Amino acid sequence: MSTLHKVKAYFGMAPMDDYEDEYYDDRAPSRGFPRPRFDDGYGRYDGDDYDDPRREPADYPPPAGYRGGYAEESRYGAVHPREFERPEMGRPRFGSWLRNSTRGALAMDPRRMAMMFEEGHPLSKITTLRPKDYSEARTIGERFRDGTPVIMDLVSMDNADAKRLVDFAAGLAFALRGSFDKVATKVFLLSPADVDVSPEERRRIAETGFYAYQ
């Protein structure tokens, strides 16, 4: 459109249909870059490229050996806490743990142990007494006076009576020039003057279970 025609159209001297405004023409702008209507192809994506949160999860095949569900209780049996039976707390015999207490170099040769109790050996007539109360002190004194080595097992006595009997035996050994030795807890050996029992023999007798030879 020429400039003259535009002036005529502005003052009403030319029909308005012939007036074309480049700023209102949506078909194609006359200058500048074309205005995209929707998109120019960049950033375009398909709906399939993104996961739909409402979509069901993929049904993957189960691992080999898996059968699903829970194990049948009848197949494996009901599982219950293991019940432990409390062992009977019986009082062990003194000789039983002594027989198993020594191993290796400290253990005495069984042949040497047997020789200690052969006829004619001082320990062959040794005796073991297990008094229940102090009234049995007389028996201990008579055996010791006759030249018999005596083992006093005071385990079954209460502490008060055991202490009295220990004092009695110590005085008895002193009066008759014997010896009085402790071989284990609440177990003592009274040896007459003519019976020589070395400390090593006393220890090994106790550790290897002297009570098996009484």
Swiss-Prot record:
Annotated InterPro entries: Cell_div_SepF, Cell_div_SepF/SepF-rel, SepF-like_sf
Subcellular location field: Cytoplasm
GO biological process, one term: division septum assembly
Biased composition (Basic and acidic residues): 36-58
One Pfam family this sequence matches: SepF
Superkingdom of origin organism: Bacteria
A GO cellular component entry from the record: cytoplasm
Region named Disordered: 23-70
Assigned keywords, A-Z: Cell cycle, Cell division, Cytoplasm, Septation
Main localization of the protein described in the UniProt heading: cytoplasm
Keyword flag Cytoplasm: yes
Purpose of the protein: Cell division protein that is part of the divisome complex and is recruited early to the Z-ring. Probably stimulates Z-ring formation, perhaps through the cross-linking of FtsZ protofilaments. Its function overlaps with FtsA.
Assembly and oligomerization: Homodimer. Interacts with FtsZ.
Family label: Belongs to the SepF family.
Protein name as annotated: Cell division protein SepF
Gene label: sepF
